[in-house]
Design a protein with these regions (language model features):
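A cross-family detector of function-defining hotspots
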Residues: 39-40, 44-45, 51-159
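Cleaved targeting-peptide boundary
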Residues: 27-41
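C-terminal segment of classical bacterial N-terminal signal peptides
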Residues: 18-26
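Bacterial N-terminal signal peptides that target proteins for export
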Residues: 2-15
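Generic leucine side-chain signal with a strong bias for well-ordered alpha-helical environments
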Residues: 16-19, 63
Length: 159
């Protein structure tokens, strides 16, 4: 049987404590939380200043006079390659915005809209929809296949 003096016993205890402290401290260090859905708000959260929840009057001030004006929807033909539809709920607030691009160079890439790449379908078209529950809406990106693709970007309140 081993017989330690008090001093030897104290030194062994101290050595064991010094070895154990870093392990205990490392176990208690909080690890950063992983990014949830890359972001709580998508990169595309407004179109020309129009956001979900904005009043119809505020949206019209941002976009100007619509080509076709209605209580539930406004249509804007911005140019030959770009149009926009803004949808309103019963409280006259924006609940959806859809932008349509017909060719041209101003088409944003999926990563700029969604924060990630869209899925390529077998026919060459692109599609991706992401829900952002913390901000209360979803965003989708659709591009048809072909030489002159049509691109639809939609942002809509989660019902």
């Amino acid at each position: 049987m081993f017989h330690f003096t008090r001093r030897a016993h104290a030194l062994c205890t101290l050595a064991l404590l010094l070895l154990a402290v870093p392990a205990v401290c490392a176990a208690q260090t909080p690890t950063p939380a992983p990014a949830q859905d890359k972001a709580e708000e998508p990169p595309f959260h407004e179109y020309k200043g129009v956001r979900i929840g904005m009043t119809a009057d505020e949206a019209r001030k941002k976009l100007g006079n619509p080509t076709d004006k209605g209580d539930k929807q406004d249509y804007y033909a911005l140019n030959d390659n770009e149009s926009c539809e803004v949808y309103y709920d019963d409280a006259k607030k924006v609940y959806a915005v859809k932008i349509t691009y017909l060719g041209g160079n101003a088409i944003p890439e999926p990563k700029k809209i969604l924060g990630i790449e869209a899925d390529t379908q077998q026919n060459g078209s692109l599609y991706k929809m992401l829900r952002f529950p913390k901000v209360g809406y979803w965003v989708s990106y659709t591009r048809t296949a072909g030489d002159s693709p049509m691109t639809l970007i939609t942002m809509q309140k989660i019902q």
